[in-house]
């Protein structure tokens, strides 16, 4: 029996020095090492391979992905929702008008508070247009 592409990709991941990626925020690609970026693309390849072979990519039985999108977005919003679904998470969009942000709470404070309930938080804020 031949080894599946996913198994080979998992073995490749074990060879990379990516220990500081677990439970760590991902803000900018320029903060990542070459091996960390390689790991990200390797995981994407493994997920694609699983999906193409009609294998489950869900690593969560249930859970919550919260999106805080401060700027209008189509591709990023749908990409985040698709990724959450692929992993088994339900997406909840944070509506700033219905949150404490409308009353002066910072996005950082809000994200910190909801992080206790979420498995992942996606934030889209064009603070640095054209960077990252």
Q: Predicted segments — roles?
A:
Residues 3-78, 82:
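Positively charged, low-complexity intrinsically disordered leader regions
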Residues 58-132:
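Phosphate/diphosphate ligand-binding glycine-rich loop within oxidoreductases
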Residues 1-3, 122:
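Generic N-terminal leader/processing signal
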